[in-house]
Every structure is written in C-alpha cells, then in structure tokens.
Amino acid sequence: MPVVISEKQFNDAHQAFKLHDKKDEGAVSNKELTNLFKSLALHVSDDKLQQWVDEMDEDATGVIRWEKFKILFERKVQEDEDERELRSAFRVLDKNNQGVIDVEDLRWILKSLGDDLNDDEIQDMINETDTDGSGTVDYEEFSALMLG
C-alpha cells in the first residue's frame, strides 16, 4: 500500500539535504548520499545506492539535485514500509515463532491471493522458494517470493 509522506517528513528531508549540500548549489554529491540517508535514519545498501545514482544521475554530474533526491526518499520510505508489512505478515504466519512458515501455509497464502494460480504453478513457486528443500520457508525465502 502506498505510503503517504507527511509535510514534516519532507521538510525534515529537505533540511537534511540542505545540510549535506556543502556548496549550497541545491545538489548533494553522490558520495554524500549515504550520510544523507543515515541522517534521516534510513539505511540504503551500497549496491542499492549505486543503482539509484546510476538511475538518477543520468548526465554523470556526480551530484543529485533535490527533485531527484525527493524521489529516492519517497522510494526508500515506501520500501521500508513494505518491509515492515512483510515482516508483520511473516510473524503472523510463523505460528510456532521459530522463524519459518510451513510450505502448506505458504500454499494457502498463494491460493488466497487470488492470482488465479493453478496447483502446478503454486507448487513451482514453492519449489523455487523453499530453496533448501526443508519443507519450511524462512523470512529471506518468503521475502524473495513476495517481493519478486
């Protein structure tokens, strides 16, 4: 579900952006982005950050302007919310609180999603998800399945 980012969150992000805009040019160096996200209590992996820089810094200027950072900020907040919701769903399905869900519960979930999957398609998804063949799915496997 899309996250609604409050005006305060945008203002906080903009203030943080300005603090990291060392030359007061309305832009932050690509190298400074990690610190900028950290200052907003958001963790972005180096690989993800590089992917975003490649996408947003189309002209290879070495900087990201506020308009582009705002897009990245929204994306990161949405990703974090999606992760929270996914973890919450996993905890509900982890009936024994052991960090795994049974593949039969996963089968039920996949049928319930209403994606018109037939039994063979569901079994293929389970086989791809339960990579270690344990008959259970841990959070990493579940996340990979649900987030694609």
From Swiss-Prot:
Name the UniProt record assigns to this protein: Troponin C
Note: This protein binds one calcium ion.
Ranges of residues in domain EF-hand: 8-43, 44-79, 81-116, 117-148
Keyword Metal-binding: yes
Annotated family: Belongs to the troponin C family.
Organism in which the protein naturally occurs: Todarodes pacificus (Japanese flying squid)
PROSITE patterns per record: EF_HAND_1, EF_HAND_2
One term under GO cellular component: myosin II complex
